[in-house]
Amino acid sequence: MRDDWNARAREDAGYYVAFGRRQQSDVDFLATATDVINILESELRRVPAPQRSMWKALEIGCGPGRLMRPMSRHFTEIHGVDVSDEMIALARERLRDTPNAHPHLTDGASLAEFPGETFDFVYSYAVFQHVPSREVIAAYMRETHRVLKTGGFARLQFNGMPARDTSLDTWSGARTTTSEIVEFTQLHDIQLLALEGAGTQYMWTTWRKQPQGWQAQQEDRQFPAGTSRIRRVTNAQSSEPGAPSRGRYASISLWVENLPADAGLHHLRVQVGDSLGTVTSIGPIMKDGLQQVSVVLPELEATGLLPVELRWLEGPLAPLATLRVIPPGPSVPCLCSVTDGTNLVADKRIETRHVKMILEEVAHPHEIEASVGGVPVGDREFLCTDPKPQRFEVDFRLPEEIGPGRHELQVSIGRRKLAPVMLEVTS
């Protein structure tokens, strides 16, 4: 593990940390962190800023300090650990003017250098997906729980894609299932506040550490009907008051008032019509006093106005609300992007003769055919990156006959031809 990541750090640390472009400038490299920082900062809103004034944070897998520097402004201390001494050296250089940021070399399997109950916030992104050992990932989950203060939060990303029948290494690591997260958090008295992106490479989960015995206490809790109130129900992707009965847009947000503070995914239930949805996240309390409860709908047979019930296990929490369910629209395949397979920000400029396509609404990926400049593409690799929108990543090499210049890429799926795309091949 250490040798592999030291070699990657020496070759091009920015590329392997923020996979997308080689030899990035420092400004460009730090800019790649924006979306992740937004995700992490949204979790901090669970606690008012004055109550976070003395918080300490830990990043697992800090690499060269890409996330630590912008996150340091939120904490009195922020610590980062990494298995690569080359990455830690880069982090120390990048953070030399950030006195509250402290990178540490670790053994790659534990957080032994920190005592229990040390941190208020622990986070990790694009790290566990590179760990080939399921046992090491499980050990880090236990260590995260150990070093968190009671009442502290963790925001962690795992690779939730289905396991593959291939050997694992320090680039394509082990996968983690939603059931493993649910079982671990239940066993360790963790309030599970989010489990998003199931079945994708970027599966995020949010934990809050509770006292020992907390989970058992929740099983017996009862709340008077009407404890909470659903103020509105909207589509999760828009403010529209409805959702399709199935497909990529079949998810909703409940905007709830007076949700119990201990509410988590283990105990909160949302029933739409006769079927249970899957609660994926419970958001922080907003300025208007409401919390967003995100729900993936089951495949519904009925359409029209359906009742929506919010429950704590089997007991009702709120008066019924309603949701307008409509039939799903037709599935229309889409070629979302075409990039160089190594330089992912090169758009349609192909520099390495390796092409990466992203397509959505693809029911039968092996019907995908492609040609460049009229020459059929040979071997293609298919990877489902998100089952909900049926998103597939398709990789191939340019045919040998294709030289530098402009060439038309034509993609078809069965008998359907997609709009052609012009590629600029440089080598």
Segments and roles (model prediction):
Residues 1-58, 64-75, 79-111, 134, ...:
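Class I (Rossmann-like) S-adenosyl-L-methionine-dependent methyltransferase catalytic domain
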Residues 53, 74, 99-100, 118, ...:
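Short loop/turn motifs at secondary-structure junctions
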Residues 112-122:
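A short acidic, Gly/Pro-enriched loop at the edge of an enzyme's catalytic core
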Residues 121-135:
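A short SAM/SAH-binding and catalytic strip from SAM-dependent methyltransferases
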Residues 138-150:
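A short glycine-rich, Lys/Arg-flanked "PGG" loop and its adjoining helix->strand segment in the class I
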Residues 220-243, 328-348:
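Short, compositionally biased P/S/T/A/G/V-rich stretches that sit at domain boundaries
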Residues 238-318, 346-426:
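Immunoglobulin-like IPT/TIG beta-sandwich domains and homologous Ig-like subdomains
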Residues 322-328, 423-427:
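Short beta-strand edge segments in extracellular beta-sheet folds
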